[in-house]
Regions:
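Core beta-strand elements of the Rossmann-like FAD/NAD(P) dinucleotide-binding domain
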Residues: 55-66
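C-terminal catalytic lobe of FAD-dependent flavoproteins
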Residues: 13-19, 23, 80, 85-130, ...
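Rossmann-like flavin
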Residues: 1-28
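Short, hydrophobic/aromatic-rich segments at coil-to-beta transitions
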Residues: 45-49, 106-108
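Flavin (primarily FAD) binding-site architecture
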Residues: 69-84
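General small-molecule cofactor/ligand-binding pocket signal
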Residues: 30-32, 173
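Short beta-strand segments that buttress and anchor functional surface loops
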Residues: 3-4, 49-53
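A conserved short coil-to-beta-strand element within the FAD-binding core of flavoproteins
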Residues: 33-47
Length: 365
């Protein structure tokens, strides 16, 4: 055997991305969610994008010197709206994961080779385990989990682990499904012989005359490097980037963390830890909120009820719900349950619906 080490996301990818968005906003960035582009055109030295609020359906024009198409699997679709011709395009691979009760008390990731030859993982998620994945060619980024997907994952895990009883569909708590945008030449036909060898790397295409950038492929693992490349290209197009060398992401200085830990210990913060929690309250608040966790500590000092778990069966406390309302751009309940937290990924839908405190959380949000 061998041991391989890598990074992992304690919450989920959506929370990971939002942390970047929130940090950028704290540094002066303007961001909006539930806004869709209806297309863009060039007028003189400016791009004019027609955008629509997906909630109230109102439209607005956004003017910009540079247009960056960072739409992920929808890059090609948006380029068609703007009339951009590129050397690359995306092909899509669908991947799914199933969330089931914890399989082993070991916190290490288990890795196997599935029947199709690709790596297959069991990833610990507190009291749950995330198993998968699949790699299925699809035509569209709009995908969902099928019975064949579930059968493939369950059969592979049951073949490779000696479980007290085989996992069945009744053990599935939640599901994850999405596509990997893989890079192909724009003129390549759809008959790709070696699907697993398609590149997971990223490519940035630049139209310097129109000041238009398209980002193809890539992974979250490399997102900061992609951002650095984009910044260099935009600066090369004559756009002055303020505070380009500032550190706007990541943990605060270690001295800030020490001060937080000292305050948390003095107020005996971990005595409020709920039985459902997979980690200490001290660790979780720091990991999720960084220096902003001081505000949560103060809320708990002022009113100890703020440390109560609000939604029964989850580890999220009352002051976190209040914080999410003010700071985390919650528009729909699903934003909180699935994107800002992992509640919808570790609890069955019917358990969430019937959880004590859910309605109060909805009123707060």
């Amino acid at each position: 055997g061998f041991e391989y080490s890598d990074a992992y996301l304690p919450d989920n990818d959506a929370r990971f991305v939002f942390q970047f968005v929130r940090s950028a906003m704290d540094q002066g960035c303007v961001a909006a969610n539930y806004v869709e582009s209806l297309g863009a055109h060039r007028v003189g030295d400016l791009w004019i994008t027609l955008a629509r609020d997906a909630i109230n359906r109102e439209t607005v024009e956004i003017r910009a010197k540079v247009l960056i198409n960072a739409a992920g699997p929808f890059v090609d679709e948006h380029n068609r709206l703007t009339g951009e011709q590129t050397e690359h395009r995306h092909l899509f691979s669908k991947g799914i994961h199933l969330i089931v009760p914890r399989i082993t008390s070991n916190r290490r990731i288990l890795a196997f080779f599935a029947d199709d030859g690709r790596l297959f993982f069991v990833i610990p998620m507190g009291t749950r385990a995330c198993i998968g994945t699949t790699d299925t060619p699809v035509e569209s980024p709009y995908v969902e989990v099928t019975e064949d997907d579930r059968r493939f994952v369950l059969e592979n895990i049951n073949k490779r682990l000696n479980l007290p009883r085989p996992l069945t569909s009744s053990d599935i708590i939640a599901e994850r499904c999405g596509v990997r945008p893989l890079i192909a030449a724009a003129k390549a036909d759809g008959d790709i012989r070696d699907w697993l060898r398609l590149s997971r790397r990223h490519e940035i295409e630049v139209d310097r005359v129109k000041a238009h950038l398209s980002i193809f492929g890539g992974k979250l693992t490399d997102c900061l490097n992609v951002g650095d490349e984009i910044s260099e290209i935009v600066a090369g197009l004559g756009i002055v980037l303020p505070r380009q060398d500032s550190r706007w992401y990541g943990e605060p200085h270690r001295s800030v963390c020490k001060d937080y830990l000292r305050q948390a210990e003095r107020m005996n913060l971990d005595s409020y830890r709920s039985s459902e929690a997979a980690e200490s309250l001290t660790d979780r608040l720091w990991r999720r909120y960084g220096a902003k966790a001081f505000e949560l500590l103060e809320a708990i000092r002022q009113d100890p009820r703020q440390a109560e778990s609000l939604i029964r069966g989850t580890e999220y406390i009352r002051c976190e719900i209040e914080w999410a309302k003010r700071q985390e751009m919650i528009v729909k309940l699903e934003d909180f349950l699935r994107r800002r937290s992992e509640i919808a990924l570790v609890m069955r839908r019917e358990d969430i619906r019937n959880a004590a405190g859910l309605m109060e959380a909805c009123e707060i949000l």
